[in-house]
Amino acid sequence: IEDTAYFMWNGDNRLAAPGYEYRSMYKTRACYPKTAVLAAATGWHLSLWYRTNRFCGACGERTVHDEKERMLRCPSCGRLIFPVIAPAVIVGVIDGDRIILTTYAGREYKRYALIAGFTEIGESAEQTVRREVMEEVGISVKNITYYKSQPWGYDSNLLMGYFCQADIPEGGDGHLTIDRQEIAT
């Protein structure tokens, strides 16, 4: 990136190299500059894709790198294999001057986070926003507005960011019904 080369080591044997250090992939999230974080996440994403697609899922033949674009190709059956990118949403749910923040249940990540989740087959991103908010905190939303997106290579995702308003009925108390399997607080 720019004039800096980044490398990923996949082996178990760590080589001592002056000026270099080994870091857990998930701990790179807090690193700076953010271009280095993007490089690490993208490298991780591609490494996982290469490792899990060494053989064709249709016929079992060893795959080869395509010379024209980022894909693998099966020389036997001709199947084309592209990197897997799972669409997901991350949602800022606003209620007046408040925003819903959660902490995940049963995960290593313990900081506050916005509601997030994967888009299912046949579902638009906006439908995902509605479903995820309803599943995780039990409220309806309105005025869903796209904000921006970012690659999230740690989990092979493309995160699409949205803001929306909590749709609390007149006289409703706005009580949240938390899915304790997903959300701790």
For each feature predicted by the language model, list its residue ranges.
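N-terminal strand-loop-strand
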Residues: K68-L114, F118, S140-V141, C164-I168
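Glycine-rich, flexible loop/turn motifs
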Residues: H45, R70, I115, G174, ...
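A gly/proline- and charged-residue-enriched helix-loop-helix capping module
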Residues: L15-A58
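Unchanged
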Residues: E2-Y32, T119-T185
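A generic structural signal for well-ordered coil/turn residues at beta-strand boundaries
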Residues: T52, P87, D95-G96, E108, ...
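Acidic, metal-coordinating catalytic segment for phosphate/diphosphate chemistry
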Residues: A40-I90
